[in-house]
Regions:
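Conserved SET/PR-domain catalytic core that frames the SAM/AdoMet-binding pocket
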Residues: 69-76
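Non-catalytic, conserved peripheral segments adjacent to functional cores
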Residues: 1-69, 81-110
């Protein structure tokens, strides 16, 4: 295969670590889709649909057999809160690179 002739579309990923009692993310995107997976620890994922005002929270725990990949669509504000005693880590996947102009801060009242 000649990679010069074939367009390459990849997956962008990064790891976010969260200390106990802290929260990370606290934003939404107007264009970007993300998928997240808990890699370590126990964390609460807080979601708010910006357009509908609907809220949802769930606890993710790597010791649980039923956690997996979670899809976050545009206009869904998201926050990861470490509710465990040790460090938590989340892997974030996206089809597009990070765009600071598409990361809109959102205040969560948790």
């Amino acid at each position: 295969m000649n990679y010069m002739d074939t367009p390459f579309t990849g997956i962008h990923s990064y790891v976010v670590s969260v200390s106990p009692g802290r929260s990370r993310a606290n934003h939404y995107h107007e264009k970007k889709e993300e998928w997240i997976a808990l890699a370590a620890g126990t964390a609460a994922l807080h979601l708010v649909d910006i357009k509908k005002g609907e809220r949802e929270s769930m606890v993710l725990d790597t010791r649980s057999a039923d956690y997996g990949l979670i899809y976050i669509s545009p206009f869904i504000a998201h926050s990861i809160e470490n509710v465990g005693n040790g460090e938590a880590a989340v892997i974030v996947f996206s089809r597009t690179p990070e765009d600071p102009s598409d990361t809109i801060p959102f205040r969560f009242d948790i």
